[in-house]
């Protein structure tokens, strides 16, 4: 795996999607850090903070020689909100949704020892078709419209620049927010792994592969010892004397499903627990659970909503300090690394979709009818 995080070239664009040629260097580019929001990285100007429309990133990429003969994939943890990605001017990926990962197979375009130009454009505009939602693109961000007709108000409207009018109560940070990596797999590879454990120790699994190589799975305990195994792409295996996952002050015990398929290997950690609602109670592993927790954001000074492992560790330690056991990902899916950390540290997670602001009842109609 090759990290592409670090300093990239950056330029603000307009609302025109194809303003710049992705095969050429960006004009008047400035340095920008990735992963991070671009909004707060230059205090000498308000242009980044107030930007409305497309923003452009670039960097050169060289594939190491040891990747020869492998499948090569370019992966983004998230780009907010809409992303277009090019290699040497060729469009390789488009993605909508600023809080989920996406990737592209670039094996045919990226060869060992060759340097190519990677260009990313991201659009921060929100409207009735985006998540989270906002008002229509291009509306003026002037909130004194109730005073229509007053000369000073009308003059302010005419002078106002188009801006986002989000229907949510947090800043609309934008940019390449989570890690960017190149990774390799064999030509025949493990595509997906599903693990569904039960508190009686049975584990249903399903492995999706791209080839015909046999699949072997092994369950490892927290010390790395094999406790169960099976052959085949799907089935059920049983963990003897299973340890259940519990939030602190209990033990957040984790197992690992070790999957092999030909030359490819994948490890998926998992905890064994059940959760259900019975009447007015939430039961974890059949026992009443009392939630003590927090809502939080990924925002922080300077890097905005950019992925920060230090901040994640600090937040988890604050949750422990408060003797809490749960966190709500208000108001969008967080970085995958945060969920892994909560699994390890015994923190329950209430995971949210980024659908804040849609509303209910009649307020939903504009979103249903949006073309």
Question: Where do the model's predicted regions map?
Answer:
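Secreted/periplasmic carbohydrate-active enzymes, especially glycoside hydrolases
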Residues: 1-336, 341, 345-349
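Aromatic- and acidic-residue-enriched carbohydrate-binding clefts of CAZyme catalytic domains
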Residues: 292-297, 351-371
């Amino acid at each position: 795996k090759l990290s592409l995080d670090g300093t990239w070239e950056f330029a603000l664009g307009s609302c025109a999607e194809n303003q710049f040629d992705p095969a050429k260097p960006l004009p008047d580019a400035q340095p920008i850090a990735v992963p991070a929001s671009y909004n707060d990285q230059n205090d000498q100007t308000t242009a980044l903070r107030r930007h409305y429309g497309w923003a452009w990133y670039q960097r050169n990429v060289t594939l190491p020689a040891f990747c020869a003969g492998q499948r090569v994939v370019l992966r983004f943890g998230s780009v907010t909100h809409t992303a277009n990605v090019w290699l040497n001017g060729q469009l390789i990926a488009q993605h909508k949704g600023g809080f989920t990962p996406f990737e592209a197979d670039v094996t045919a375009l990226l060869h060992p020892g060759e340097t190519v130009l990677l260009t990313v454009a991201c659009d921060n505009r929100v409207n009735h078709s985006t998540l989270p939602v906002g008002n229509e693109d291009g509306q003026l961000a002037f909130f004194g419209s109730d005073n229509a007709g007053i000369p000073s108000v009308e003059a302010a409207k005419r002078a106002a620049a188009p801006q986002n009018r989000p229907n949510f109560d947090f800043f609309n940070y934008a940019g390449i927010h989570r890690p960017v990596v190149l990774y390799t797999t064999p030509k025949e590879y493990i595509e997906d792994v599903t693990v569904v454990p039960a508190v009686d120790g049975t584990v249903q699994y399903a492995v999706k592969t791209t080839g015909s190589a046999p699949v072997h799975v092994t369950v490892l305990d927290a010390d790395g010892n094999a406790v169960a195994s099976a052959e085949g792409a799907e089935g059920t295996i049983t963990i003897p004397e299973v340890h259940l996952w519990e939030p602190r002050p209990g033990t957040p015990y984790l197992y690992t499903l070790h999957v092999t398929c030909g030359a490819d290997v994948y490890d998926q950690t998992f905890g064994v627990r059940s959760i259900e609602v019975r009447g007015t109670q939430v039961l974890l592993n059949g026992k009443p659970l009392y939630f003590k927790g927090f809502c939080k954001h990924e925002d922080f000074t300077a890097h905005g909503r950019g992925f920060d492992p230090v901040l994640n560790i600090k937040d988890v330690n604050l949750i422990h300090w408060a003797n809490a056991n749960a966190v709500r990902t208000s108001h969008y899916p967080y970085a995958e690394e945060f969920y892994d950390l909560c699994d390890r540290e015994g923190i329950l997670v209430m995971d949210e979709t980024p659908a804040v602001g849609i509303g209910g009842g009649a307020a939903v109609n504009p979103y249903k009818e949006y073309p």
